[in-house]
């Protein structure tokens, strides 16, 4: 690890932000701090993550939503002080890292399948076979 990476990792730990582990295809709610005149409020921006850029302190992600029939994309810096919180609403099952093809689609063709959690019975059976193999 070079000096710049070390400084960035120290800065990330100093910020103490808890960023959930999300990926492209996930539906997230980003709570953004907005200043209007002398008032400060939190604005929720809900949409699908279409891209994620992992660059340490300079990491960013792009969220797309359809508002009044128009597609709106917004790019957020992951460690920005303007982001109050990030909440994952739904996990999406996609096979691409960048979902830019969603820009050309609308309606049913723009839907993303939901990633279902592994069944408990399947996990128990898998754990049981691993224990018998180790014995």
From Swiss-Prot:
SUPFAM superfamilies: Translation proteins SH3-like domain. The keyword Ribonucleoprotein applies. InterPro entries: Ribosomal_bL19, Ribosomal_bL19_CS, Ribosomal_bL19_sf, Translation_prot_SH3-like_sf. GO terms for biological process: translation. It comes from the Bacteria. Keywords: Ribonucleoprotein, Ribosomal protein. One of its GO terms (cellular component) is cytosolic large ribosomal subunit. PROSITE patterns: RIBOSOMAL_L19. Residues 108-135 are annotated as: Disordered. GO terms for molecular function: structural constituent of ribosome. Pfam families: Ribosomal_L19. Gene3D superfamilies: 2.30.30.790. Residues 108-117 have a biased composition (Basic and acidic residues). Belongs to the bacterial ribosomal protein bL19 family. This protein is located at the 30S-50S ribosomal subunit interface and may play a role in the structure and function of the aminoacyl-tRNA binding site. This is Large ribosomal subunit protein bL19. The lineage of its organism: Bacteria, Pseudomonadati, Pseudomonadota, Betaproteobacteria, Nitrosomonadales.
């Amino acid at each position: 690890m070079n000096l710049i990476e070390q400084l960035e990792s120290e800065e990330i730990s100093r910020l103490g932000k808890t960023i959930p582990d999300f990926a492209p295809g996930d539906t997230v709610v980003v709570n953004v701090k907005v200043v209007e005149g002398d008032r400060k409020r939190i604005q929720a921006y809900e949409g699908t993550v279409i891209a994620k850029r992992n660059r340490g302190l300079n990491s960013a992600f792009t969220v797309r939503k359809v508002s009044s029939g128009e597609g709106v994309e917004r790019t957020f810096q992951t460690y920005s002080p303007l982001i109050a919180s990030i909440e994952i609403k739904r996990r999406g099952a996609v096979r691409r890292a960048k979902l830019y093809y969603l820009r050309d689609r609308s309606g049913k063709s723009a839907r993303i399948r939901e990633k279902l959690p592994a069944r408990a019975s399947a996990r128990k059976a898998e754990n049981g076979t691993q224990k018998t193999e180790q014995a």
